[in-house]
Amino acid sequence: MRRVRRGDTGEWHMYELIQVSERDYYIQSPAKIGLVRLNAQDVCLIDSGNDKDAGRKVRQLLDANGWRLTAIYNTHSNADHIGGNKYLQGQTGCKVYAPGIECSFTRHPILEPSFLYGGCPFKELRHKFLMAQENDAQLLTREALPDGFEILPLPGHFFDMVGFRTPDDVVYLADCLSSRETLEKYQIGFIYDVGAYLKTLEMVKTLRAAMFVPAHAEASGEIADLAQYNIDKVMEIAERIVDICREPICFESILQRLFTEFGLNMSYEQYVLVGSTVRSYLSWLKDTNRVRCGFEENRMLWERA
């Protein structure tokens, strides 16, 4: 186990336990897993990783430290954040809590690929990266939190996503922003509600904490600059879409142009993730009068307003 402090940089090994305060930790993984000591024996998790194997590695860390898992607090229901729930709940009997609509998605994971695809998902969309195993989640309420915890609403990336502030003033930020490296590589990060996402990022810029732990960026004592970088990237994508819509164009052609111009590779997974996000951009741009849409020869076409 290592300790990270403000200003620290370094390479962490996958599933290494990193301490960020007296009682707060995270487990280095594709989507960081928060761990908070509640007393000498009991701990809770903030998210659980992307699958059974992640859950197994978390269990090994718990056993190595003599800790007992009492609860998992899910920030939202994306598969890479709830994938370890079923295994850990089965092994430890811990409770699982998820906020709002996310609780339904956590209890019924088929909802995620169905929502992304817009219909019954075919088998190539029913895999662990888009659909976790079902688990017995309860609705997250303030009463379900350990003493001193605070819920931070972070809507935008997904329906009812939240973060948490702990008694040691550590803020776990879930997926409300991504690292510069991630955005430079993938360009179009997943967003459900662009307007809400931008408002969340503006709020995050004002936050102060002893340490911030985003799921897809390095832990840091400062977050405002990275939040602004994410805002700038959203605006860049939005402007690119508006430019593509100079002439009437259908959704599939917009998506093709974006993949080609950003050098992205199409796959089933990327089609639904980026495709859903581009639809969300179009909705936001339409509602803010940047683009309009209509029908021609039984096709919906988008055009700059």
Ranges and model annotations:
Residues N50, E150-E236:
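Metallo-beta-lactamase
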Residues D232-P248:
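Positively charged, polyanion-binding regions of nucleic-acid-associated proteins
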Residues E11-N65, G163-D175:
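Conserved beta-strand hairpin/beta-sheet module of binuclear metal-dependent hydrolase folds
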Residues R3-H13:
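Short, Lys/Arg-enriched N-terminal segments with co-localized hydrophobic residues
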Residues R23, V36, D47, H76, ...:
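Divalent metal-coordination and catalytic microenvironments
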Residues I27-S29, L145, L154-F158:
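A short catalytic or substrate-binding loop motif that flags glycine-/basic-rich loops and adjacent residues
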Residues G55-L145:
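Active-site HxH/HxHxD metal-binding segment of metal-dependent hydrolases
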Residues D243-A305:
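C-terminal regulatory/interaction regions
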